[in-house]
């Protein structure tokens, strides 16, 4: 019931066989659909899976979500926090070099326990509390300057526009290295930088010269409005938190809003892991530090502008 022409189209990718045809072919040749479609020589039935120790496919886990992938970031962060773990540096380095698999995962969990139970070095000279009352107790005194309500709207609008404009300026070249960015800017007559980088700057000849993929980026001369970006999403998300919970919102409210309003891939590094922690049932404040090597990265510092807007 299958013509030669149909098979040729399937082989070349011109068309895809209907499910009924696939079933007919598998029956005709006496092979299972698993073998035919997935290349498996043995069919795995549901009953087998019930008693199997199922493992994740570690290579498919994003590095930000795999604690072991950031184990040297954990070491650096922990030593910056004054934790006495230098004697384990060789262990951290050895685990870091392992392939991305179950063994690396298990050993990283052992190192995490070492970090959790480590003492602060006696010679550590900094005081870095996490509790708000303790932070306030250590801060310097400062005088509050009264703001003119007439100017606030214009200032807040300017701050929001500044964030958008600056974000768009960097969006076109996020991740590029200076040894490629500077030659590129010189070649496009934009060095020192005095205007936005344009799509019209990116010719095929220019793009072939660099490892950075300029062709796939977003540019101001091909858009009508600001595209979504994590560096602007959080400001909008903060507004939604206040709209839904008022000024007396709690960390738990924030976790619920994060899960509700954005998918996982909208978050990066520390925020990505915190999101995954919410999903797994870890709640604030533990969710902000549990298996997060990136916990003191710049993300939190650059997400707080909205709270300044509404508390002038």
What is the predicted role of each segment?
Residues 11, 34, 230:
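Acidic active-site catalytic centers that drive phospho-/nucleotidyl reactions
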Residues 20-35:
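DNA major-groove recognition helix of helix-turn-helix/homeodomain DNA-binding modules
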Residues 12, 38-42, 256-259, 263:
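Short amphipathic alpha-helical surface patches that mediate protein-protein
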Residues 2-16, 38:
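Recognition helix of helix-turn-helix/homeodomain-like DNA-binding domains
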Residues 33-52:
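Charged, helix-prone or intrinsically disordered regulatory segments positioned adjacent to compact structured domains
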Residues 48-312:
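Structured, active/binding-site neighborhoods that engage oxygen-rich ligands
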